[in-house]
Curated annotation (Swiss-Prot):
Organism name: Vesicomyosocius okutanii subsp. Calyptogena okutanii (strain HA)
Keyword Zinc applies: yes
UniProt record similarity statement: Belongs to the class-I aminoacyl-tRNA synthetase family. MetG type 1 subfamily.
Binding locations of ATP: K332
SUPFAM superfamilies (alphabetical): Anticodon-binding domain of a subclass of class I aminoacyl-tRNA synthetases (SSF47323), Methionyl-tRNA synthetase (MetRS), Zn-domain (SSF57770), Nucleotidylyl transferase (SSF52374)
Annotated CDD domains: Anticodon_Ia_Met, MetRS_core
EC annotation from Swiss-Prot or TrEMBL: 6.1.1.10
Protein name as it appears in the record: Methionine--tRNA ligase
Cofactor note: Binds 1 zinc ion per subunit.
Length: 545
Protein backbone atom coordinates (compact mmCIF):
# COMPACT_ATOMS: atom_id res chain seq x y z
CA UNK A 1 0.00 0.00 0.00
CA UNK A 2 1.41 3.37 -1.06
CA UNK A 3 2.07 5.85 1.74
CA UNK A 4 0.01 9.03 1.51
CA UNK A 5 1.58 12.47 1.89
CA UNK A 6 -0.67 14.61 4.06
CA UNK A 7 -0.50 18.15 5.45
CA UNK A 8 -2.93 18.95 8.25
CA UNK A 9 -3.71 22.23 10.01
CA UNK A 10 -5.84 23.44 12.91
CA UNK A 11 -7.18 26.98 13.16
CA UNK A 12 -4.70 29.42 14.67
CA UNK A 13 -5.34 30.41 18.30
CA UNK A 14 -5.42 34.18 18.79
CA UNK A 15 -2.42 35.52 20.67
CA UNK A 16 -4.26 37.74 23.16
CA UNK A 17 -5.76 35.03 25.37
CA UNK A 18 -5.04 31.65 26.90
CA UNK A 19 -6.18 28.25 25.68
CA UNK A 20 -9.47 26.97 27.14
CA UNK A 21 -11.41 23.73 26.82
CA UNK A 22 -13.36 25.08 23.84
CA UNK A 23 -10.13 25.58 21.89
CA UNK A 24 -8.89 22.13 22.85
CA UNK A 25 -11.81 20.38 21.18
CA UNK A 26 -10.34 21.15 17.76
CA UNK A 27 -6.69 20.48 18.57
CA UNK A 28 -7.52 17.14 20.17
CA UNK A 29 -9.74 16.23 17.22
CA UNK A 30 -6.94 17.05 14.78
CA UNK A 31 -4.18 15.42 16.81
CA UNK A 32 -6.10 12.12 17.03
CA UNK A 33 -6.51 12.09 13.25
CA UNK A 34 -2.84 12.89 12.63
CA UNK A 35 -1.65 10.21 15.07
CA UNK A 36 -3.93 7.69 13.37
CA UNK A 37 -2.51 8.58 9.94
CA UNK A 38 1.02 8.07 11.21
CA UNK A 39 0.05 4.70 12.71
CA UNK A 40 -1.22 3.75 9.25
CA UNK A 41 2.25 4.44 7.86
CA UNK A 42 1.36 7.72 6.13
CA UNK A 43 3.65 10.74 5.99
CA UNK A 44 1.60 13.30 7.88
CA UNK A 45 2.70 16.80 8.88
CA UNK A 46 0.65 18.81 11.38
CA UNK A 47 1.30 22.55 11.47
CA UNK A 48 -0.20 25.45 13.37
CA UNK A 49 0.77 28.91 14.61
CA UNK A 50 -0.32 31.73 16.84
CA UNK A 51 -2.57 34.25 15.08
CA UNK A 52 -0.55 37.25 16.16
CA UNK A 53 -1.86 40.32 14.31
CA UNK A 54 -4.70 42.79 14.64
CA UNK A 55 -6.05 45.71 16.63
CA UNK A 56 -6.88 43.55 19.65
CA UNK A 57 -3.22 42.52 19.99
CA UNK A 58 -2.08 46.13 19.69
CA UNK A 59 -4.56 47.33 22.34
CA UNK A 60 -3.81 44.46 24.73
CA UNK A 61 -0.09 45.20 24.55
CA UNK A 62 -0.79 48.88 25.15
CA UNK A 63 -2.91 48.00 28.18
CA UNK A 64 -0.08 45.87 29.61
CA UNK A 65 2.52 48.54 28.72
CA UNK A 66 4.57 46.12 26.62
CA UNK A 67 5.25 45.85 22.90
CA UNK A 68 3.03 43.62 20.74
CA UNK A 69 6.11 41.51 20.00
CA UNK A 70 6.63 40.78 23.70
CA UNK A 71 2.92 40.02 24.16
CA UNK A 72 2.76 37.51 21.32
CA UNK A 73 6.00 35.82 22.36
CA UNK A 74 4.77 35.37 25.93
CA UNK A 75 1.40 34.08 24.77
CA UNK A 76 2.96 31.70 22.27
CA UNK A 77 5.04 30.15 25.04
CA UNK A 78 1.92 29.66 27.17
CA UNK A 79 -0.03 28.18 24.28
CA UNK A 80 2.71 25.71 23.42
CA UNK A 81 3.09 24.54 27.03
CA UNK A 82 -0.66 23.90 27.22
CA UNK A 83 -0.69 22.06 23.90
CA UNK A 84 2.24 19.88 24.93
CA UNK A 85 0.48 19.05 28.20
CA UNK A 86 -2.49 17.72 26.23
CA UNK A 87 -0.17 15.75 23.88
CA UNK A 88 -0.96 17.91 20.84
CA UNK A 89 1.98 16.88 18.68
CA UNK A 90 2.58 19.61 16.11
CA UNK A 91 5.27 19.04 13.49
CA UNK A 92 5.74 22.81 13.56
CA UNK A 93 4.21 25.55 15.69
CA UNK A 94 4.98 29.03 14.39
CA UNK A 95 3.59 32.58 14.42
CA UNK A 96 1.85 34.67 11.77
CA UNK A 97 4.25 37.46 12.79
CA UNK A 98 7.15 35.77 11.01
CA UNK A 99 9.36 36.42 8.03
CA UNK A 100 7.96 33.35 6.27
CA UNK A 101 4.42 34.68 6.62
CA UNK A 102 5.39 38.16 5.52
CA UNK A 103 7.12 36.81 2.41
CA UNK A 104 4.28 34.49 1.37
CA UNK A 105 1.55 37.06 2.17
CA UNK A 106 3.34 39.67 0.10
CA UNK A 107 3.86 37.19 -2.73
CA UNK A 108 0.18 36.18 -2.80
CA UNK A 109 -0.99 39.79 -2.63
CA UNK A 110 1.32 40.81 -5.48
CA UNK A 111 0.08 37.93 -7.65
CA UNK A 112 -3.54 38.86 -6.97
CA UNK A 113 -2.82 42.53 -7.65
CA UNK A 114 -1.05 41.89 -10.96
CA UNK A 115 -3.90 39.61 -12.05
CA UNK A 116 -6.44 42.39 -11.40
CA UNK A 117 -8.08 40.84 -8.34
CA UNK A 118 -7.31 43.75 -5.99
CA UNK A 119 -9.58 46.81 -6.15
CA UNK A 120 -9.58 50.09 -4.23
CA UNK A 121 -12.38 52.37 -3.15
CA UNK A 122 -13.07 54.98 -0.50
CA UNK A 123 -15.23 53.91 2.44
CA UNK A 124 -16.69 55.71 5.44
CA UNK A 125 -15.77 54.36 8.87
CA UNK A 126 -16.16 55.15 12.53
CA UNK A 127 -13.08 56.97 13.83
CA UNK A 128 -11.97 57.62 17.41
CA UNK A 129 -10.82 61.27 17.45
CA UNK A 130 -9.07 60.85 20.81
CA UNK A 131 -7.09 57.72 19.96
CA UNK A 132 -6.72 58.80 16.32
CA UNK A 133 -7.68 55.39 14.98
CA UNK A 134 -10.41 53.77 12.94
CA UNK A 135 -12.66 51.50 14.95
CA UNK A 136 -13.55 47.93 14.08
CA UNK A 137 -17.16 46.95 14.80
CA UNK A 138 -16.34 45.26 18.11
CA UNK A 139 -14.74 48.45 19.42
CA UNK A 140 -17.98 50.44 19.15
CA UNK A 141 -21.08 50.11 21.31
CA UNK A 142 -24.38 51.94 21.20
CA UNK A 143 -28.13 51.60 20.68
CA UNK A 144 -29.44 49.28 17.98
CA UNK A 145 -30.83 51.39 15.09
CA UNK A 146 -33.66 48.86 14.62
CA UNK A 147 -34.96 47.98 18.11
CA UNK A 148 -33.20 50.54 20.31
CA UNK A 149 -31.49 48.01 22.62
CA UNK A 150 -28.46 49.55 24.26
CA UNK A 151 -24.91 48.22 24.68
CA UNK A 152 -24.89 46.61 21.22
CA UNK A 153 -21.76 46.18 19.09
CA UNK A 154 -21.20 47.96 15.81
CA UNK A 155 -22.22 45.17 13.44
CA UNK A 156 -25.24 43.32 14.83
CA UNK A 157 -27.79 43.40 17.63
CA UNK A 158 -27.80 40.43 20.02
CA UNK A 159 -31.37 41.29 21.06
CA UNK A 160 -33.26 41.54 17.76
CA UNK A 161 -30.66 39.97 15.45
CA UNK A 162 -30.48 42.95 13.10
CA UNK A 163 -27.28 43.63 11.16
CA UNK A 164 -26.09 47.12 10.28
CA UNK A 165 -22.98 49.22 9.74
CA UNK A 166 -21.23 50.81 12.70
CA UNK A 167 -22.05 54.32 11.53
CA UNK A 168 -25.79 53.50 11.83
CA UNK A 169 -25.47 52.78 15.58
CA UNK A 170 -27.28 55.34 17.78
CA UNK A 171 -25.51 57.03 20.72
CA UNK A 172 -22.32 55.24 19.73
CA UNK A 173 -19.25 55.26 21.97
CA UNK A 174 -15.72 54.04 21.41
CA UNK A 175 -15.05 51.03 23.64
CA UNK A 176 -11.41 52.11 23.74
CA UNK A 177 -11.72 55.74 24.85
CA UNK A 178 -15.41 56.28 25.63
CA UNK A 179 -15.71 59.23 23.24
CA UNK A 180 -18.27 59.52 20.48
CA UNK A 181 -16.82 58.32 17.16
CA UNK A 182 -16.88 60.52 14.10
CA UNK A 183 -17.27 59.32 10.52
CA UNK A 184 -14.17 59.53 8.37
CA UNK A 185 -13.33 58.46 4.82
CA UNK A 186 -10.41 56.22 3.92
CA UNK A 187 -9.23 54.41 0.81
CA UNK A 188 -9.32 50.64 1.31
CA UNK A 189 -8.09 47.65 -0.66
CA UNK A 190 -10.49 44.87 -1.61
CA UNK A 191 -10.07 41.32 -2.84
CA UNK A 192 -12.53 40.88 -5.71
CA UNK A 193 -14.18 37.68 -4.50
CA UNK A 194 -17.11 37.79 -6.98
CA UNK A 195 -14.65 37.09 -9.83
CA UNK A 196 -14.18 33.58 -8.37
CA UNK A 197 -17.85 32.67 -8.05
CA UNK A 198 -17.82 30.01 -10.79
CA UNK A 199 -14.66 28.27 -9.48
CA UNK A 200 -15.90 28.47 -5.89
CA UNK A 201 -19.29 26.96 -6.75
CA UNK A 202 -17.51 24.07 -8.46
CA UNK A 203 -15.07 23.62 -5.58
CA UNK A 204 -17.69 23.74 -2.82
CA UNK A 205 -19.78 21.07 -4.57
CA UNK A 206 -16.89 18.72 -5.34
CA UNK A 207 -16.82 16.81 -2.05
CA UNK A 208 -14.35 19.04 -0.21
CA UNK A 209 -16.89 20.01 2.46
CA UNK A 210 -19.43 18.40 4.77
CA UNK A 211 -22.97 18.49 3.37
CA UNK A 212 -24.21 20.94 6.01
CA UNK A 213 -21.41 23.35 5.14
CA UNK A 214 -21.93 22.99 1.40
CA UNK A 215 -25.63 23.75 1.87
CA UNK A 216 -24.82 26.86 3.91
CA UNK A 217 -22.48 28.09 1.19
CA UNK A 218 -25.26 27.67 -1.36
CA UNK A 219 -27.28 30.19 0.67
CA UNK A 220 -24.37 32.64 0.58
CA UNK A 221 -24.01 32.22 -3.18
CA UNK A 222 -27.70 33.08 -3.59
CA UNK A 223 -27.20 36.25 -1.56
CA UNK A 224 -24.27 37.15 -3.83
CA UNK A 225 -20.57 37.33 -3.01
CA UNK A 226 -19.13 40.68 -1.97
CA UNK A 227 -15.68 42.17 -2.39
CA UNK A 228 -13.61 41.55 0.74
CA UNK A 229 -11.89 44.41 2.54
CA UNK A 230 -8.32 43.16 3.11
CA UNK A 231 -6.83 46.41 4.42
CA UNK A 232 -6.72 48.24 7.73
CA UNK A 233 -5.50 51.73 8.52
CA UNK A 234 -2.61 52.61 10.80
CA UNK A 235 -2.17 52.28 13.71
CA UNK A 236 -2.34 48.51 13.29
CA UNK A 237 -0.15 45.57 14.28
CA UNK A 238 0.49 43.51 11.18
CA UNK A 239 2.20 43.56 7.79
CA UNK A 240 2.19 46.74 5.73
CA UNK A 241 0.68 46.41 2.27
CA UNK A 242 3.51 46.62 -0.29
CA UNK A 243 4.14 50.14 -1.61
CA UNK A 244 1.19 51.60 0.31
CA UNK A 245 1.88 53.94 3.21
CA UNK A 246 -0.25 53.59 6.35
CA UNK A 247 -2.19 50.54 5.15
CA UNK A 248 -1.88 47.03 6.59
CA UNK A 249 -3.14 43.59 5.66
CA UNK A 250 -6.28 42.70 7.60
CA UNK A 251 -5.51 39.91 10.05
CA UNK A 252 -7.75 37.47 8.19
CA UNK A 253 -5.68 37.84 5.03
CA UNK A 254 -2.40 36.67 6.54
CA UNK A 255 -3.90 34.25 9.11
CA UNK A 256 -4.66 31.35 6.71
CA UNK A 257 -1.43 32.08 4.87
CA UNK A 258 0.09 31.31 8.26
CA UNK A 259 -0.60 27.64 7.51
CA UNK A 260 1.72 27.89 4.53
CA UNK A 261 4.28 29.90 6.49
CA UNK A 262 4.43 27.38 9.33
CA UNK A 263 4.85 24.56 6.83
CA UNK A 264 7.54 26.55 4.98
CA UNK A 265 9.52 26.79 8.21
CA UNK A 266 9.16 23.04 8.70
CA UNK A 267 10.27 22.43 5.11
CA UNK A 268 13.37 24.58 5.58
CA UNK A 269 14.26 22.76 8.80
CA UNK A 270 13.62 19.21 7.57
CA UNK A 271 14.43 19.48 3.86
CA UNK A 272 10.83 18.88 2.74
CA UNK A 273 9.75 20.08 -0.71
CA UNK A 274 7.27 22.92 -0.05
CA UNK A 275 6.18 23.08 -3.68
CA UNK A 276 5.26 19.39 -3.72
CA UNK A 277 2.50 20.24 -1.25
CA UNK A 278 1.34 23.62 -2.60
CA UNK A 279 1.88 23.55 -6.36
CA UNK A 280 -1.33 23.83 -8.34
CA UNK A 281 -0.99 20.24 -9.61
CA UNK A 282 0.05 18.75 -6.25
CA UNK A 283 -0.84 15.10 -5.59
CA UNK A 284 -0.46 15.50 -1.83
CA UNK A 285 -3.39 15.96 0.55
CA UNK A 286 -4.18 19.17 2.45
CA UNK A 287 -6.77 19.26 5.25
CA UNK A 288 -7.94 22.13 7.46
CA UNK A 289 -9.69 21.38 10.77
CA UNK A 290 -11.74 24.42 11.84
CA UNK A 291 -14.75 25.55 13.85
CA UNK A 292 -17.99 26.12 11.96
CA UNK A 293 -17.87 29.84 12.82
CA UNK A 294 -14.97 30.52 10.43
CA UNK A 295 -16.29 28.66 7.39
CA UNK A 296 -16.75 31.84 5.34
CA UNK A 297 -13.04 32.63 5.52
CA UNK A 298 -11.86 29.08 4.85
CA UNK A 299 -14.36 27.89 2.25
CA UNK A 300 -14.67 31.09 0.20
CA UNK A 301 -11.88 33.64 0.75
CA UNK A 302 -9.09 31.11 1.25
CA UNK A 303 -9.63 28.87 -1.82
CA UNK A 304 -10.26 31.98 -3.94
CA UNK A 305 -6.95 33.50 -2.80
CA UNK A 306 -5.18 30.23 -3.59
CA UNK A 307 -6.79 29.94 -7.03
CA UNK A 308 -5.99 33.58 -7.80
CA UNK A 309 -2.33 33.18 -6.83
CA UNK A 310 -1.94 29.85 -8.66
CA UNK A 311 -1.65 27.53 -5.66
CA UNK A 312 -3.50 24.28 -4.97
CA UNK A 313 -6.77 24.31 -3.00
CA UNK A 314 -7.49 22.18 0.11
CA UNK A 315 -8.41 18.52 -0.31
CA UNK A 316 -11.08 19.06 2.34
CA UNK A 317 -12.13 21.35 5.16
CA UNK A 318 -13.34 19.57 8.29
CA UNK A 319 -15.61 21.75 10.44
CA UNK A 320 -16.77 20.95 13.95
CA UNK A 321 -19.39 22.44 16.26
CA UNK A 322 -18.97 24.53 19.39
CA UNK A 323 -18.31 23.23 22.88
CA UNK A 324 -20.93 23.65 25.57
CA UNK A 325 -20.41 22.66 29.18
CA UNK A 326 -23.36 21.19 31.08
CA UNK A 327 -25.58 22.11 28.14
CA UNK A 328 -24.76 25.83 28.14
CA UNK A 329 -22.18 28.24 26.79
CA UNK A 330 -18.99 28.37 28.81
CA UNK A 331 -19.53 30.81 31.68
CA UNK A 332 -17.17 32.33 34.21
CA UNK A 333 -19.97 32.95 36.71
CA UNK A 334 -20.93 29.26 36.58
CA UNK A 335 -17.29 28.18 36.74
CA UNK A 336 -17.47 26.51 33.34
CA UNK A 337 -15.17 28.86 31.43
CA UNK A 338 -12.33 26.44 32.10
CA UNK A 339 -8.80 27.30 31.02
CA UNK A 340 -6.52 24.47 29.90
CA UNK A 341 -4.14 25.22 32.76
CA UNK A 342 -6.93 25.12 35.36
CA UNK A 343 -8.01 21.70 34.12
CA UNK A 344 -4.42 20.41 34.20
CA UNK A 345 -4.04 21.46 37.82
CA UNK A 346 -6.62 18.85 38.83
CA UNK A 347 -7.13 16.20 36.16
CA UNK A 348 -5.32 13.90 33.74
CA UNK A 349 -5.34 15.45 30.22
CA UNK A 350 -6.10 12.04 28.71
CA UNK A 351 -9.52 12.02 30.40
CA UNK A 352 -10.48 14.97 28.20
CA UNK A 353 -8.93 13.48 25.07
CA UNK A 354 -11.02 10.34 25.54
CA UNK A 355 -14.25 12.17 26.35
CA UNK A 356 -13.92 14.40 23.30
CA UNK A 357 -13.20 11.33 21.16
CA UNK A 358 -16.27 9.62 22.61
CA UNK A 359 -18.38 12.64 21.55
CA UNK A 360 -16.82 13.70 18.25
CA UNK A 361 -18.19 12.75 14.85
CA UNK A 362 -17.75 14.03 11.30
CA UNK A 363 -20.80 16.27 11.72
CA UNK A 364 -20.89 19.92 12.79
CA UNK A 365 -23.19 19.42 15.78
CA UNK A 366 -22.17 21.12 19.01
CA UNK A 367 -20.40 18.95 21.59
CA UNK A 368 -21.51 19.04 25.22
CA UNK A 369 -19.04 18.39 28.01
CA UNK A 370 -21.41 17.28 30.75
CA UNK A 371 -19.19 17.12 33.81
CA UNK A 372 -21.25 14.41 35.55
CA UNK A 373 -21.28 12.23 32.43
CA UNK A 374 -17.57 13.03 31.93
CA UNK A 375 -16.69 11.59 35.34
CA UNK A 376 -18.90 8.55 34.89
CA UNK A 377 -17.66 7.88 31.35
CA UNK A 378 -13.98 7.95 32.31
CA UNK A 379 -14.50 5.86 35.43
CA UNK A 380 -16.62 3.33 33.56
CA UNK A 381 -14.93 3.05 30.15
CA UNK A 382 -11.26 3.64 30.82
CA UNK A 383 -10.77 2.63 34.45
CA UNK A 384 -13.55 0.07 34.87
CA UNK A 385 -13.34 -1.61 31.46
CA UNK A 386 -10.13 -1.06 29.48
CA UNK A 387 -7.52 -0.80 32.26
CA UNK A 388 -9.41 -3.38 34.30
CA UNK A 389 -8.54 -6.09 31.75
CA UNK A 390 -4.83 -5.69 32.46
CA UNK A 391 -5.12 -5.07 36.19
CA UNK A 392 -7.15 -8.30 36.63
CA UNK A 393 -4.75 -10.44 34.61
CA UNK A 394 -1.21 -9.14 35.03
CA UNK A 395 -0.81 -10.26 38.64
CA UNK A 396 -1.23 -13.92 37.69
CA UNK A 397 1.36 -13.67 34.90
CA UNK A 398 3.87 -11.86 37.11
CA UNK A 399 3.48 -13.87 40.32
CA UNK A 400 2.66 -17.36 39.04
CA UNK A 401 4.22 -17.61 35.59
CA UNK A 402 7.52 -15.74 35.85
CA UNK A 403 6.14 -12.68 33.97
CA UNK A 404 5.90 -14.79 30.81
CA UNK A 405 2.83 -15.18 28.59
CA UNK A 406 1.77 -18.69 27.59
CA UNK A 407 3.00 -20.39 24.44
CA UNK A 408 -0.44 -20.64 22.85
CA UNK A 409 -3.94 -19.33 23.34
CA UNK A 410 -6.97 -21.55 23.85
CA UNK A 411 -9.30 -18.94 22.33
CA UNK A 412 -7.61 -18.00 19.06
CA UNK A 413 -10.97 -17.21 17.41
CA UNK A 414 -11.65 -14.70 20.17
CA UNK A 415 -8.34 -12.94 19.46
CA UNK A 416 -9.15 -13.00 15.74
CA UNK A 417 -12.47 -11.27 16.44
CA UNK A 418 -10.65 -8.40 18.17
CA UNK A 419 -8.11 -8.21 15.35
CA UNK A 420 -10.80 -8.21 12.66
CA UNK A 421 -12.47 -5.16 14.23
CA UNK A 422 -9.37 -3.15 13.32
CA UNK A 423 -10.67 -2.44 9.82
CA UNK A 424 -13.95 -0.88 10.94
CA UNK A 425 -12.21 1.07 13.72
CA UNK A 426 -9.69 2.40 11.18
CA UNK A 427 -12.54 3.46 8.88
CA UNK A 428 -14.18 5.34 11.75
CA UNK A 429 -10.92 7.13 12.57
CA UNK A 430 -10.32 8.02 8.93
CA UNK A 431 -13.86 9.43 8.63
CA UNK A 432 -13.40 11.35 11.94
CA UNK A 433 -16.25 9.38 13.50
CA UNK A 434 -14.29 8.86 16.68
CA UNK A 435 -17.49 8.33 18.64
CA UNK A 436 -18.18 5.20 16.59
CA UNK A 437 -14.60 3.97 16.99
CA UNK A 438 -14.80 4.38 20.78
CA UNK A 439 -18.08 2.45 20.93
CA UNK A 440 -16.59 -0.49 19.04
CA UNK A 441 -13.53 -0.47 21.32
CA UNK A 442 -15.58 -0.35 24.54
CA UNK A 443 -17.84 -3.12 23.24
CA UNK A 444 -14.71 -5.24 22.80
CA UNK A 445 -13.49 -4.27 26.28
CA UNK A 446 -16.79 -5.53 27.69
CA UNK A 447 -16.29 -8.85 25.88
CA UNK A 448 -12.77 -9.19 27.28
CA UNK A 449 -14.01 -8.60 30.81
CA UNK A 450 -16.85 -11.06 30.30
CA UNK A 451 -14.30 -13.62 29.14
CA UNK A 452 -12.29 -13.16 32.35
CA UNK A 453 -15.49 -13.32 34.43
CA UNK A 454 -16.51 -16.52 32.69
CA UNK A 455 -13.23 -18.34 33.40
CA UNK A 456 -12.64 -16.88 36.90
CA UNK A 457 -8.84 -17.28 37.04
CA UNK A 458 -8.89 -16.24 40.71
CA UNK A 459 -10.77 -19.46 41.45
CA UNK A 460 -8.95 -21.68 38.96
CA UNK A 461 -5.57 -20.75 40.43
CA UNK A 462 -6.52 -22.59 43.61
CA UNK A 463 -6.74 -25.88 41.69
CA UNK A 464 -3.35 -27.49 40.94
CA UNK A 465 -4.59 -29.08 37.70
CA UNK A 466 -5.89 -25.75 36.30
CA UNK A 467 -2.64 -23.77 36.28
CA UNK A 468 -2.21 -24.06 32.52
CA UNK A 469 -5.72 -22.79 31.89
CA UNK A 470 -5.12 -19.82 34.21
CA UNK A 471 -1.94 -19.09 32.27
CA UNK A 472 -3.75 -19.24 28.93
CA UNK A 473 -6.79 -17.23 30.05
CA UNK A 474 -4.75 -14.40 31.55
CA UNK A 475 -2.27 -14.43 28.65
CA UNK A 476 -5.11 -14.05 26.18
CA UNK A 477 -6.59 -11.25 28.31
CA UNK A 478 -3.26 -9.40 28.20
CA UNK A 479 -3.18 -9.85 24.42
CA UNK A 480 -6.72 -8.52 24.08
CA UNK A 481 -5.70 -5.53 26.19
CA UNK A 482 -2.76 -4.97 23.81
CA UNK A 483 -5.15 -4.90 20.85
CA UNK A 484 -7.48 -2.41 22.54
CA UNK A 485 -4.63 -0.11 23.57
CA UNK A 486 -3.31 -0.14 20.01
CA UNK A 487 -6.74 0.99 18.82
CA UNK A 488 -6.79 3.67 21.55
CA UNK A 489 -3.25 4.89 20.98
CA UNK A 490 -4.26 7.92 18.81
CA UNK A 491 -6.54 9.04 21.66
CA UNK A 492 -4.41 8.07 24.69
CA UNK A 493 -0.75 8.48 23.67
CA UNK A 494 0.55 8.88 27.23
CA UNK A 495 -1.17 5.75 28.50
CA UNK A 496 -0.07 3.92 25.35
CA UNK A 497 3.57 4.61 26.25
CA UNK A 498 2.99 3.26 29.75
CA UNK A 499 1.38 0.16 28.26
CA UNK A 500 4.33 -0.32 25.90
CA UNK A 501 6.61 -0.35 28.95
CA UNK A 502 4.32 -2.76 30.81
CA UNK A 503 4.13 -5.10 27.79
CA UNK A 504 7.89 -4.80 27.27
CA UNK A 505 7.55 -3.88 23.58
CA UNK A 506 8.99 -1.06 21.49
CA UNK A 507 5.73 0.39 20.21
CA UNK A 508 2.09 -0.53 19.75
CA UNK A 509 1.73 -0.85 15.97
CA UNK A 510 -1.52 -1.51 14.12
CA UNK A 511 0.18 -3.87 11.67
CA UNK A 512 1.70 -5.97 14.49
CA UNK A 513 -1.69 -7.05 15.84
CA UNK A 514 -2.05 -9.97 13.45
CA UNK A 515 -0.02 -12.07 15.84
CA UNK A 516 -0.47 -12.22 19.63
CA UNK A 517 2.47 -12.05 22.01
CA UNK A 518 3.63 -15.64 22.61
CA UNK A 519 6.15 -16.75 25.28
CA UNK A 520 6.75 -13.06 25.80
CA UNK A 521 7.97 -11.59 29.06
CA UNK A 522 6.09 -8.59 30.42
CA UNK A 523 6.88 -6.19 33.25
CA UNK A 524 5.14 -5.68 36.57
CA UNK A 525 1.81 -3.92 36.13
CA UNK A 526 1.51 -0.41 37.57
CA UNK A 527 -1.78 1.52 37.81
CA UNK A 528 -2.43 3.26 34.48
CA UNK A 529 -5.37 5.51 35.28
CA UNK A 530 -7.15 6.62 38.44
CA UNK A 531 -10.85 7.26 38.93
CA UNK A 532 -12.16 10.84 38.84
CA UNK A 533 -13.52 11.95 42.20
CA UNK A 534 -16.34 14.48 42.68
CA UNK A 535 -14.12 16.91 44.56
CA UNK A 536 -11.75 17.19 41.57
CA UNK A 537 -14.59 18.44 39.38
CA UNK A 538 -15.77 20.78 42.14
CA UNK A 539 -12.31 22.29 42.54
CA UNK A 540 -12.03 22.97 38.81
CA UNK A 541 -15.38 24.79 38.85
CA UNK A 542 -14.40 26.88 41.88
CA UNK A 543 -11.02 27.75 40.38
CA UNK A 544 -12.73 28.87 37.15
CA UNK A 545 -15.11 31.38 38.78
Amino acid sequence: MTSRKILVTSALPYANGEIHLGHLLEYIQTDIWVRFQKMMGNECHYVCADDAHGTAIMLKADELDITPEVLIKNMSNKHQIDFQSFSIDFSQYHSTHSQENKDISTNIYNKLNVAGFIKTRVISQAFDPLKQMFLADRFIKGDCPKCGSNEQYGDNCEVCGATYSSIELKNAKSVISGVTPITKDSEHYFFDLPQFEVQLKEWTKAGHLQDAISNKLSEWFKEGLQQWDISRDAPYFGFQIPAVEGKYFYVWLDAPIGYMASFKKLCDEQNIDFNEYFNKDSNTELYHFIGKDIIYFHALFWPAMLIGSNYRTPSAIFAHGFLTINGQKMSKSRGTFIQARTYLNYLNPEYLRYYYAYKLSSKIDDIDLNLIDFKQRINSDLVGKVVNIASRSAGFIVKKFNKTLSSYTIESKFYQEFFDCGDIIAKHYEARNYNQAMRVIIKLANKANQYIDKHKPWQLIKKPNQQTQVHDVTSLAINLFRVLMTYLKPVLPIMAKQVEKFLNIDELHWQDLKYPLIKHQINTFKPLMLRIEDDQIERIIEASK
